[in-house]
């Protein structure tokens, strides 16, 4: 049986990063995303520049204003975050169907079945992070290990825009020297109880008996005992079977030039074909989505008699759909191409290994 390989991907300061992407004047500034200070709102996300002032998520906005009076305060735009998250989750699903989203900006991926001697889990994580950045302009951090607990722990060790692998050769050193407050799932209240029992590091936790931990923490004690030893048997729970594969891009400036847009549709058709190839799937519906400079979204879909998976076949349909949708007088800022109603491909497509190694 193959040794498990789990990736935990966590987007960096997700809400704030989306705001910086959509408003480049915010880059490098202390950005705080949340509700109004006057309505007892709380901080949803703070950029790393804002965190230097002590601002953190779940903090009352009124307190954030006191700590960082010159910060850039932005009202949360959940539609924008959900849209970015949908693209990110689709990237995950293009690699494996065994994806467990934990929130809009965080998920576990079981890639055990993809790993080969010439294709490591860390290499796959690098490709996933690359795809996220290319398609959304957002950075992410990844943790790679042989269980969920360690993958989650690893993803926070080289933030932002980093990656960490925890394996059998370094797990003991990492866990034994880890501050107890840095263990996933140990919050302020638990940390205080830990300190009351002289537990300050992973080594201190490791030295406690299972009986002691259960007595102090109840049912959680068993889990803490196992985690101190790097043990976690929980599985990545896939949420649903993939029904479509798609790719979209946001233009750096609003565009209404047909040649430029059609070139982008060709690129998106190729990228979608590559994803279908990795999954050995084809689909019998093609959808083109346009978002205008005024943030209005339009889409058009066509059902096909025969499923498609090749770039040229996808492009030919997408070309027609775009011509049906376009308004020469209305610039667009985003375009997407999606293939749906998936089925097992009848073509001799590349495997995921061929694609990744290209």
From Swiss-Prot:
Gene3D superfamilies: 3.30.70.270, 3.40.1170.60, 5' to 3' exonuclease, C-terminal subdomain, DNA polymerase, Y-family, little finger domain. InterPro entries: DNA/RNA_pol_sf (IPR043502), DNA_pol_Y-fam_lit_finger_sf (IPR036775), DNA_pol_Y-fam_little_finger (IPR017961), DNA_polymerase-Y (IPR050116), DNApol_IV (IPR022880), Rev_trsase/Diguanyl_cyclase (IPR043128), UmuC (IPR001126). It catalyses: DNA(n) + a 2'-deoxyribonucleoside 5'-triphosphate = DNA(n+1) + diphosphate. GO terms for molecular function: damaged DNA binding; DNA-directed DNA polymerase activity; magnesium ion binding. Its main location: cytoplasm. The record marks 15 as: Substrate discrimination. GO terms for cellular component: cytosol. GO terms for biological process: DNA-templated DNA replication; error-prone translesion synthesis; SOS response. The active site is at 106. Residues 6-187 form the UmuC domain. Binds 2 magnesium ions per subunit. Its EC number is 2.7.7.7. Mg(2+) binds at residues 10, 105. Disulfide bonds: none annotated. Coiled coil: none annotated. Pfam families: IMS, IMS_C. Keywords: Cytoplasm, DNA damage, DNA repair, DNA replication, DNA-binding, DNA-directed DNA polymerase, Magnesium, Metal-binding, Mutator protein, Nucleotidyltransferase, Transferase. It is an enzyme of class 2 (transferase). It is found in: Cytoplasm. Its cofactor is Mg(2+). Belongs to the DNA polymerase type-Y family. Poorly processive, error-prone DNA polymerase involved in untargeted mutagenesis. Copies undamaged DNA at stalled replication forks, which arise in vivo from mismatched or misaligned primer ends. These misaligned primers can be extended by PolIV. Exhibits no 3'-5' exonuclease (proofreading) activity. May be involved in translesional synthesis, in conjunction with the beta clamp from PolIII. Monomer. This is DNA polymerase IV. It comes from Staphylococcus haemolyticus (strain JCSC1435). The lineage of its organism: Bacteria, Bacillati, Bacillota, Bacilli, Bacillales.
